[in-house]
Amino acid sequence: MSSQFEQLKLLSVLVCDTGDPELVKSSGSQDATTNPSLILKVAQEPKYQEMLTEAIAWGIRQNGDDVQTLTFVLDKIQVNFGLEILKCIPGRVSLEIDARLSFNTEAMVQRAIFLSELFVASGGDKKRLLVKIPGTWEGIQAVEILEKQGISCNVTLIFNLIQAIAAAKAKATLISPFVGRIYDWWIAAYGDEGYSIDTDPGVASVSNIYTYYKKFDIPTQIMAASFRSKEQVLALAGCDLLTVSPKLLDELKKDQSSVTKKLDVAEAKKLDVQPVELTESVFRFLMNEDAMATEKLAEGIRIFSGDTQILEAAVTEFIKQIAAQDA
């Protein structure tokens, strides 16, 4: 029998979740996702110094002030890693805008346009880029604007059905509901007694979103993310896409147990699901009612913002070193 990895590829598009191009290459996945946290882990490794140095030199050549230069460099780093990753896969890569813009629609639109244009100017195919936008109300409004301009968006940090519904209304290309972080919250809040893979709250959340989307023929793709175990991945076999860490992908490759399809369009259409009438007030109220979604969205933004600041600090030091050498 073939590996679980090969079996799963017949049911879902597998995506490698890492900032390391070499790991993407060995993963055998279709697409790849990354973020400031993942890029931070690999950007300072000696084997990637050339990409980092080139991004810094390019940013300095734009002749902006210190803040602008840092912005240029950070986006160029993402683009460089994204383009390197695309050499290793046939599909798309997701790159993320600065999480500190999460509550400013106009700023997110401007940054996403800049990132997309830089990606194309650096030799990338626009059709192979997904721009990651946080699932705040403001972020989802930015997505609606960007999709109309031909910029495909991946709405990330999805923890609640209402976020998914709002993203669908904005005609987002794709959403990323976070399985593991939902599970983490419930374990921290109520302990781990009584949870099995069949009652895993993260798995249940994605299953509910899948049912809603397929019931109403919503074209926005669902890419389940943030897995804590191989079992969580397998519990969502049949989801449009699954973005999985290299470690868990390796576990799937080593196991030849049979894989069963868990999510199915025909079955979803049979279920009794009522459409939700979306307004901003409904969105904000339902998010407020969901302590888990509210807390994990806020935490996710803080984590990505913090990692961006750490990456900024490292880049600032590199810029100083280059300036000192040129002095």
Swiss-Prot record:
This is Transaldolase. Homodimer. It comes from Chlamydia felis (strain Fe/C-56). Belongs to the transaldolase family. Type 1 subfamily. One of its GO terms (molecular function) is transaldolase activity. It catalyses: D-sedoheptulose 7-phosphate + D-glyceraldehyde 3-phosphate = D-erythrose 4-phosphate + beta-D-fructose 6-phosphate. The lineage of its organism: Bacteria, Pseudomonadati, Chlamydiota, Chlamydiia, Chlamydiales. Keywords: Cytoplasm, Pentose shunt, Schiff base, Transferase. Its EC number is 2.2.1.2. CDD domains: Transaldolase_TalAB.
